[in-house]
Amino acid sequence: MSKLRRRQRCPKCGSLDIIRWGIRNNHQRYKCSNCGSSFIRKQPTVSSANRFIWFRKWVLGKQTIQDIAEISGYSERHLRRWFDDYLSQSPKWEITRHANTHILVDGTWLDSDHCLILYRDSDLKTTIYYSFAETEDEYAIIKDLQALKTMRLRISSFTSDGSEDIIRAIKYCYPHIDRQRCVVHIERECLSWLTQHPKTSAGITLRRLVCQISHIKTSNDKLFWIKQIREWHDEYEEFIKQKTVNKETGEMTYTHDNVRRTYIHIKRALPNMFKYIDNPSIPNNTNSLESFFGHLKDNLRIHRGMSIEH
């Protein structure tokens, strides 16, 4: 019997003195000349590894299961069966505890019935908790925050958008923790109300101040900006109080409603707008969550049709 070109190692004694020893059940048998033991060298681990490579490409990439079938040579039926097995074996959720955890919280709608609420450690850039709810309301978020308490995390701050439900829930469960408003959300919402080209001097001046929000980095910047906002209000207080009567309905509405709404939005957010200046470890925006949601929805569009459990 001929020696192997690519020499195998005996699994029993480790010898490389191996010879072919016939065929059984369509598998090549080998015999060790050193210890006399015979064995069949199968490679199930390679097959399993290959399957997982295709699974990763499907889950994390942009290929559909039809694309994977065409590239890999496996049938769609086999791929679905293998992938379902992997999906049923969800990875173990491990939380890394450390001092001064700064949490980003936000929600997004995956469809009309499922709202994903995500809690992310800003320092570790890791999701520490998530939940699905029928609506992004105060009670659902309180339930999540109570679950966070059981993890015994040392939470130092929360950063969120202007959702009243999130703000009330955090205030209820963590009344003494710093709450930072996302300055990007504040700026974006205010600019949407003021439009790109305001028609009044009040709107033009306020828009200029709004565009400075995300560039405020120091205590001096903060104090100077707040001073300008107060001066703006002193100058235009009567202007934003003006009302117009609808001739058809007789209803009175604010004449410059968008300018007024922008100022009120800033005024309400102001107590929690600049926590990050006193503590630079506190993130001042939830951009990383917005980016994560964007990638997640891109993947969900590729995998549309999967069951809710998966």
PLM ranges: what are they?
Residues 3-9, 25-28:
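Short metal-coordination and nucleic-acid-contact micro-motifs, chiefly zinc-binding Cys/His arrays
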